[in-house]
Amino acid sequence: VIFRQTLHSKSAYLQVRYIGAADRGRELVRVHRDRPGSSIQIVEPANLQPKADRDYFRETAARAPGRVYLSDINLNRELGVVEKPKLPVIRASVPVHFEGAFYGMVVINLAIAPTFEYLATIGNRSHVLYLTNAKGEYLRHPDSSLSFAFETGGTHTVFSDFPTVAHVLDGSVESVSLLSDTGETLLGSRVIPFGPDDLG
């Protein structure tokens, strides 16, 4: 009931799950919807999946009690296969302990595409938004075939298009701007830290 109400109140939340420590990290409760705003479903026990092989399970299991883990932004997968149409998500999870022992975790999948599209609409309409992860892999690109291409074996990165951005991502400079002869900004690049340590 609590998980269902959480999805009702947060339209961008796609899944709320309790994943146990036992049985290869099997989901014990999963409430989900296919897309933001779509109908909410409670998954039948026969369709619950083991998740111990996923990065977010291992990272969350290793955290201290009460410490939130934020996953990389990637495409949602079901049974190990990228879901179609593509569904970019970020996962927030927290471990559950009892008497000092790890018992499982609560995991929330959040649809991140609406946030990307909002960012693309703010500011000057003539600007084009590119978003990457820390490796320079595209999360959002004007050519949609390059967005999340790394999830399907693609190797095209921001360094291919804008080599100077490497100095921002490796931390050697805080930001990069390229100006035209008339002083107009042609390219602006900045790292925005986002992870569990940025939650305060």
Question: Can you annotate each of these PLM segments?
Answer:
Residues 1, 48, 52, 167-168:
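Soluble or luminal CAZymes and related metallo-dependent hydrolases
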Residues 2-9, 43, 79, 101, ...:
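Solvent-exposed, extracytoplasmic
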Residues 8-34, 51, 62-69, 120-140, ...:
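Short N-terminal helix-loop-first-beta-strand/juxtamembrane motif that initiates sensory/input modules
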Residues 12, 85-90, 125, 183:
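Exposed loop/turn and edge beta-strand positions of beta-sandwich/beta-sheet ligand-binding modules
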Residues 19, 95-97, 132, 193-196:
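Core beta-strand residues in small-molecule sensory/regulatory alpha/beta domains
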Residues 33-110, 117-118:
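Extracytoplasmic/periplasmic ligand-binding sensor regions of membrane-associated signaling proteins
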Residues 33-36, 145-148, 195:
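Short, surface-exposed beta-strand-loop junctions and turns on beta-sheet-rich folds
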Residues 101, 155-200:
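Extracellular/periplasmic juxtamembrane segments that couple receptor/chemosensory ectodomains to their
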